């Protein structure tokens, strides 16, 4: 009996020593192993990414000229919502328009807008305020509110400079104080505009402009003429666009090229805002959502797939126009507002 107990204890000791030896021989985890495990755990699944990217367009970021896509970190940075351009970059859906602002007003309003949350600023050579826009952006950067890559800046080459487009584009960048301009547009059709568009395409290759487009071109024929002038498809067409002129036919046509319609005068423009703000349909929908008429109109714009750039020198209005990301219009409301389109343009540019 004693001998049996002795053998049993001996066997148990052998098993215990074997287990300890096996545990000691296992390779310890290196810091790299630990980091790899943490990385695999922290990366969201594809399904999670799709759920969290609801503000982003599903359009692939393939540049229209066939070159490599823009850096991914540049493409997903606008918390207020953005759209994918066919250039491979992303563009915020709401911005500040600066038409009629002086340099001093532009500096003040751009700074305030960026502080409020805007990440898209629209200017033009014709406005005469590129220096002010640049100063406002620089103040925001110097104050640590944003980095340069956080803000999308648009300018436009004016007809008077169509004879020397390369120098004109460089001069805009200089006045803005920028190494590159996010989007450069031809301001309107005119003599030599096809050559100007070729210069814009060249500016993309030079790296001084990232995306290009056209402004105040309202028909598919006009678009095709400009598109065929160079090897880069326009990323944006910026036109008059509001309740009573919604560019629906052009917008539908441009979809095949992943070209986005951007709206100047999205609230109707000077002398016409009151009529649109007092529209019975807009007033009723605004009361339902506890929002103002301009907020309903701007919400409709971005929810329809447009980019809107309302302009103002009033800080309260700038802040009000930005406050449109905490609600959505229903499908029925969207259809009601769509039905308000009368095909009426207020300007003849």
Predicted regions and their residues:
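Post-signal peptide N-terminal segment of mature Sec-exported envelope proteins
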Residues: 29-68, 76
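Short, acidic/polar
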Residues: 101-114, 161-176, 195, 220-224, ...
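N-terminal binding-site loop/beta-alpha segment at the start of enzyme catalytic domains
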Residues: 56, 61-149, 267-268
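A short, structured active-site edge motif that brings together acidic residues
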Residues: 147-161, 182-189, 216, 241
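C-terminal motif of bacterial Sec signal peptides marking the signal peptidase cleavage site
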Residues: 17-19
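Beta/alpha (TIM)-barrel catalytic core signal, keyed to glycine-rich beta->alpha loops juxtaposed to Asp/Glu
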Residues: 188-349
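Bacterial lipoprotein signal-peptidase II cleavage site
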Residues: 21-28
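Positively charged n-region of N-terminal signal peptides that target proteins for export
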Residues: 1-6
């Amino acid at each position: 009996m004693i001998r049996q107990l002795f053998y049993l204890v001996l066997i148990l000791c052998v098993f215990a020593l074997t287990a300890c030896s096996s545990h000691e021989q296992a390779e310890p985890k290196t810091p790299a192993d630990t980091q790899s495990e943490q990385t695999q755990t922290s990366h969201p699944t594809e399904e999670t990414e799709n759920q969290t990217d609801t503000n982003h367009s599903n359009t692939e970021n393939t540049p229209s000229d066939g070159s490599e896509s823009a850096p991914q970190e540049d493409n997903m940075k606008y918390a207020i919502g953005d759209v994918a351009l066919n250039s491979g970059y992303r563009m915020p859906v709401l911005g500040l328009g600066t038409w009629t602002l002086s340099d001093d007003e532009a500096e003040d309003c751009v700074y305030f807008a960026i502080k409020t949350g805007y990440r898209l600023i629209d200017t033009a050579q014709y406005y005469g305020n590129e220096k002010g826009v640049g100063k406002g952006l620089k103040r925001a950067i110097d104050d640590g509110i944003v980095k340069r890559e956080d803000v999308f800046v648009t300018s436009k080459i004016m007809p008077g400079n169509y004879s020397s487009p390369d120098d004109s584009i460089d001069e805009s960048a200089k006045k803005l104080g920028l190494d590159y301009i996010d989007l450069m547009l031809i301001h309107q059709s005119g003599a030599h505009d096809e050559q100007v568009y070729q210069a814009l395409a060249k500016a993309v290759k030079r790296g001084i402009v990232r995306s290009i487009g056209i402004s105040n071109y309202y028909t598919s024929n006009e678009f095709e003429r400009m598109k065929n002038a160079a090897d880069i498809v326009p990323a944006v067409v910026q036109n008059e666009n509001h309740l009573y002129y919604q560019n629906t036919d052009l917008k539908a046509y441009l979809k095949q090229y992943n070209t986005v319609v951007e709206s100047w005068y999205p609230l109707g423009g000077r002398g016409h805002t009151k009529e649109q703000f007092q529209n019975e349909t807009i007033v009723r929908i605004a009361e339902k959502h506890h929002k103002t008429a301009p907020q309903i109109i701007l919400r409709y714009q971005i929810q329809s797939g447009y980019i809107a750039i309302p302009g103002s020198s009033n800080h309260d209005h700038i802040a009000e126009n930005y406050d449109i990301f905490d609600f959505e219009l229903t499908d029925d409301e969207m259809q009601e507002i769509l039905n308000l389109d009368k095909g009426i343009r207020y300007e003849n540019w």
